[in-house]
Amino acid sequence: MATAASGPCAGGSPRDILWRVLGWRIVTSVVWSVLLLPVCITAFIVFSSIDLFHPIQWLSDSLNEFYSSQVIFYLLLLAVVIIIISIFNVEFYTVVPSIPGSRLALIARILHPQQLTHSFIHAVMGMAVAWCAAIMTKGQSRSLVVPCTGTESLDSPAAQTCMNEYHLFFLLSGAFMGYSYSLLYFINNMNYLPFPIIQQYKFLRFRRSLLLLVKHSCVESLFMVRNFCIVYYFFGHIPKAWISTALDLRTDEQAHRPLDTIGGLLNVSLLYHVWLCGVFLLMTWYISWILFKIYATEAYMFPVQPPFAEESDECLPKVLNSNPPLIIKYLALQDLMLLSQYSPSRRQEVFSLSQPGGHPHNWTAISRECLSLLNDMTQKLVLYQEAAATNGRMYSSYSVEPKRLSSPEETAFQTPKPSQMPSVPPLVKTSLFSPKLSTPDGSSPFGTPFGSSVVNRMAGIFDVNTCCGSPQSPQLVRRGPRLWTHTSDQQVSAVSNPSPCASVTAEGKTVRQPSVLYSWIQNKREQIKNFLSKRVLIMYFFSKHPEASIQAVFSDAQMHIWALEGLSHLVAASFTEDRFGVVQTTLPAILNTLLTLQEAVDKYFKLPHASSKPPRTSGSLVDTSYKTLRFAFRASLKTAIYRITTTFGEHLNAVQASAEHQKRLQQFLEFKE
């Protein structure tokens, strides 16, 4: 297993920690990208001057060309391009993929000022690469200005030079390929850093990706050349006329056909060299991108205990419970998962007690953060299902007084911060799924066990029409309680027959009827919405894909998977390694949290489209594993519970838990889940 050695625990700001962890990795990836550049240039020179009938002369000329001073200058220029591309890789990376819910959201993302800057810089860098490639090909495209071939060009000195359209075609194709690379970079989430499931040496990971990189570059360059030829056929006359006018150059149509015609574009030699230039550009940029991903996602070993108390900012418990950059949080959780499985000595540090005092600070900090992450996922699934119960509709109402910001219901469902969660209550189930708390009142027309404040936070404030007998309210009301709890007959009758117009909010305030103006505005808004929904083009951009919203719920599930695996392995190892019994104090909370999350996941996968698997894209250079993270999370959750139950066995019957959780736990003990 390849893991990086850790440095000492040192204090500092989050940016200092980020630089200490990732700084040398970024520099090393850039250095290797530059060192591999001569290999790519040599391959480009060899294939650009291919001559199968004279192979000895072909290879000797290629080697002589590589050692020329001109190529060395281009090597330095291309090294600068690689460094700039690497800087943009570092600036735009993310560990949580961005999943747009509609085509309009994707367009808005592409047109963001940062993305536009990214595209512009890559277009300029692509033009620089194409300029170097055009000169190294030794063909008709070496220079933008060439002598005219016609006799009429000798009338005046200014008319003796003409524009070389081949060179212009090369430059514009490089800019187009650079922009296309940037466009696909965000559309395909290439800035997403997927962490490897199996830890391997960096060389093995790069060697495994090399053949796929070459294949992907060749195919993608072919499509880019096709698209550029189409664009140049329709709009190529615009830059050609502008450059001819700006530089006072003539267009020599006697030397070759214009390239913005079908006959001019059917130049096999030109298309081959442009395609080869695209392969060279994509390979050098993809190498830089792959090396950065390999180095950035390599496992990092955080020390569990600092040598001194004042030097604990980079230690595992402190990093997990602080707010570092997200990639540092991911690396810390990955390290927790690895130490829980493969490092008995570091597990002993987790189970150790502080001296003096005898407190399990390491275990408390680690378990608290893991339980906080799992509770966050439970709340996210709860809120998503509450939104799905109302079909994602937004409601609004008028209340006499504004809603309070610190109600107990809202406080219970806010994302807990690590500093605000000293411990997790042993019966998490009762706060979410207990039937005693699920009695609907007048403030909760949907009859959910969470009160109206949770739904209000998700979907705005409720519309009074849902309580006043609107045509759609009975369907929405009936669907609400079915998500979480089995309601009694009295509850069903109370929900099915809400009071006509008067209701009471959670704060005990009455809700008044909307004004005539408000009703008229609501009706007009519905009419406009219905009118636009019948237009195919508008719905093409505004319609939301259900798979995207489902993927967005689990977009950051990788760290929850590591929290599950790390916590469950530590609990299982504590059965024989925990000499002080520090895990036993939090075992009820851990089991109840896992079982609560298991029930939420089971109910989530009963929703439409949740169980549908997207098509697999095997053999692709772009990682799409984030699309199936929900299935990996469900499998990891069930495996984590089984790991604990098979280790402790019947001893778990003595753990304090609710009746439903005891029943669910017994099913795991009997391997019936």
From Swiss-Prot:
Intracellular or extracellular location(s): Nucleus, Nuclear pore complex; Nucleus membrane
Chain spans, region Disordered: 406-425
Record's bilayer topology term: Multi-pass membrane protein
Residue numbers of Phosphoserine PTMs: S407, S438, S444, S470, S473
Transmembrane domains' residue ranges: 26-46, 72-92, 116-136, 167-187, 227-247, 274-294
Source organism, top-level taxon: Eukaryota
Predominant place of localization: nucleus
Single GO molecular function: protein-macromolecule adaptor activity
Post-translation changes: Phosphorylated.
Family matches, as InterPro entries: Nucleoporin_prot_Ndc1/Nup (IPR019049)
Keyword entries, A-Z: Membrane, mRNA transport, Nuclear pore complex, Nucleus, Phosphoprotein, Protein transport, Translocation, Transmembrane, Transmembrane helix, Transport
Start-end of Polar residues biased regions: 408-422
Family statement drawn from the similarity comment of this UniProt entry: Belongs to the NDC1 family.
Protein name: Nucleoporin NDC1
UniProt source species: Rattus norvegicus (Rat)
